C-alpha cells in the first residue's frame, strides 16, 4: 500500500476505533442477527455469468479521491429506484465518509427504496465492520485484497458466510488473485483502477480473467462507461460490471442504464 490507500486505511482504522466506543461490537452482533431477509447478490451475478448475459451492479457514489465531488446532492433512494427501473442486477453503495462522502444512511435509504440486493462498498478491515454491515441491512460486502492479509481475508469471508452476507473480493493483479483464490473467494471483482496511483486501464480485467478458475465469477470494475467498454470486456468472458461515475453523471439514468444493457 502507498500514498492515498495508506492514508485511507489509517483513517479507517481510527474511525473504527472510535465507532467501537459509540456502539459496542456485542450490540452490533445482536442487531446483525435481527436484519431483514437477505436478497440474492451473488446468485444474481452467477446466473448472469452462466447465461452469458450482462449484469450491472449500479453504484451510488457521491465523490472519490480521484474525481472529487461527483454529485453532492445525490438522493440515494431516488438513485436506487432509477437503477432498479433501468434493469440493474444489484446496487453498490459507497459508505466511506472522509474520501467518498458516503454513509450507512445512504445504504439504508437505497435498500428501502428498491428490491435489489445491496453491496456495501467500504474499506473493511475488521469483524466489527462486517457486523456493522449486516446490522445496516447490507446483502453483501466488498473485501479488498490490497488492504488485507490472506488470513484476514479468509477469516472475514468466513464471518460473512456465517452471517449470510455475500462477498465481492476485489483484486488488481495476479498476486491479488492468488491471495483471493487461496482464501476461497468465488465472486471476484477486478478493479481496473490501481488503488496506489488511481490510474485506470480496462485491459487489466481482460488480462486477469484468463487466470480465473471455472468456479470463479469475475466482475469488472472502474473505467466501464460505455456499451463499447462492456462489449470489449464481455469478449474476454466477463459478464458482470460495477459501474458508478458514468451512471451518477448521466442526465437520464434509466435510459443510460438500459442502453448499457442493450445487446
Curated annotation (Swiss-Prot):
It holds the Pfam family IGPS. Its EC number is 4.1.1.48. Pathway: Amino-acid biosynthesis; L-tryptophan biosynthesis; L-tryptophan from chorismate: step 4/5. Keywords: Amino-acid biosynthesis, Aromatic amino acid biosynthesis, Decarboxylase, Lyase, Tryptophan biosynthesis. PROSITE patterns: IGPS (PS00614). The keyword Kinase does not apply. The keyword Protein biosynthesis does not apply. PANTHER family: INDOLE-3-GLYCEROL-PHOSPHATE SYNTHASE (PTHR22854:SF2), TRYPTOPHAN BIOSYNTHESIS PROTEIN (PTHR22854). This is Indole-3-glycerol phosphate synthase. It comes from Desulfosudis oleivorans (strain DSM 6200 / JCM 39069 / Hxd3) (Desulfococcus oleovorans).
Amino acid at each position: 500500500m502507498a500514498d492515498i490507500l495508506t492514508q485511507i486505511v489509517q483513517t479507517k482504522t481510527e474511525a473504527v476505533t472510535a465507532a467501537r466506543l459509540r456502539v459496542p461490537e456485542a450490540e452490533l452482533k445482536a442487531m446483525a442477527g435481527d436484519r431483514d431477509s437477505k436478497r440474492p447478490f451473488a446468485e444474481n451475478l452467477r446466473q448472469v455469468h452462466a447465461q452469458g448475459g450482462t449484469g450491472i451492479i449500479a453504484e451510488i457514489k457521491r465523490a472519490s479521491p480521484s474525481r472529487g465531488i461527483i454529485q453532492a446532492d445525490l438522493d440515494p433512494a431516488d438513485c436506487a429506484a432509477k437503477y432498479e427501473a433501468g434493469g440493474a442486477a444489484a446496487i453498490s453503495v459507497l459508505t466511506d465518509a472522509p474520501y467518498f462522502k458516503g454513509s450507512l444512511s445512504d445504504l439504508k435509504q437505497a435498500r428501502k427504496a428498491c428490491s435489489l440486493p445491496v453491496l456495501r462498498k467500504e474499506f473493511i478491515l475488521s469483524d466489527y465492520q462486517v457486523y456493522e454491515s449486516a446490522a445496516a441491512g447490507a446483502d453483501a460486502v466488498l473485501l479488498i485484497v490490497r488492504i488485507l492479509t490472506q488470513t484476514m481475508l479468509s477469516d472475514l469471508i468466513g464471518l460473512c458466510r456465517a452471517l449470510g452476507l455475500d462477498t465481492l473480493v476485489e483484486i488488481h493483479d495476479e498476486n491479488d488473485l492468488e491471495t483471493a483464490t487461496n482464501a476461497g473467494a468465488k465472486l471476484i471483482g477486478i478493479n481496473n483502477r490501481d488503488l496506489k496511483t488511481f490510474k485506470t486501464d480496462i485491459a487489466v480485467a481482460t488480462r486477469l480473467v484468463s487466470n480465473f478458475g471455472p468456479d470463479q465469477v469475475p466482475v469488472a470494475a472502474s473505467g466501464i462507461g460505455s456499451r463499447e467498454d462492456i462489449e470489449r470486456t464481455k469478449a474476454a468472458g466477463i459478464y458482470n460490471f460495477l459501474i458508478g461515475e458514468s451512471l451518477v453523471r448521466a442526465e437520464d439514468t434509466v435510459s443510460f442504464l438500459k442502453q448499457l444493457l442493450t445487446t
